[in-house]
A protein has these predicted regions:
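Acidic/histidine-enriched, beta-strand-rich ligand/metal-binding domains
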Residues: 78, 85-87, 122-125
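Conserved acetyl-CoA-binding loop-helix of GNAT-fold acetyltransferases
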Residues: 82, 88-101
Length: 150
């Protein structure tokens, strides 16, 4: 079995590779332009990557934090992707585990995400509850999923 390690992007080269991977996996298949893989919360978010022995990125995930209901902190996982040839090896599960651990460390009450229809079973197996169908900016079926952390 190949060897992987997990980290946060640190160098300019890693950040560039991170955003390129994100676009290739999550935006290009929908015909979206380079640049659509970023949003206004990048600097505030906690980013994780999975790398091969030669430091190629094969998995990514991000979590950012929101204040809701006056002081209650909520977390949203976004931009989860694992290269097709590495799916089923536990990489996505480990990325989500690390993101949720960061949320717990910050005392977050709940964590949510918008999952593509084909990913709902994956997130349910990790403890997320399916809430409702939602409209996504990609015009592709997505579902609101939530996990209570307290």
């Amino acid at each position: 079995m190949p060897s992987f390690h997990y980290d946060s992007p640190a160098t300019d080269e890693q950040w560039q590779a991170y955003y390129q991977f994100r676009w290739q996996q999550l935006r290009r298949p929908f015909g979206l332009a380079l640049g659509t893989e970023r949003d206004a919360l990048e600097d505030q978010a906690y980013h994780r990557i999975c790398l091969t022995e030669d430091n190629s990125i094969i998995g990514i995930g991000r979590i950012h934090y929101e204040t809701i209901k006056a002081q209650q902190l909520s977390a949203r996982i976004r931009y989860m992707a694992v290269a097709a040839e590495f799916q089923g090896l536990g990489i996505g599960r480990e990325l989500v585990t690390q993101l949720v651990a960061d949320a717990r460390k910050r005392g977050v009450a709940d964590c949510y995400l918008h999952a593509r229809e084909e990913a709902c079973g994956f997130y349910q197996a990790l403890g997320f509850e399916l809430k409702e169908g939602i409209q996504s900016e990609l015009d592709h079926p997505h579902f609101l999923m939530q996990m209570r952390l307290d």
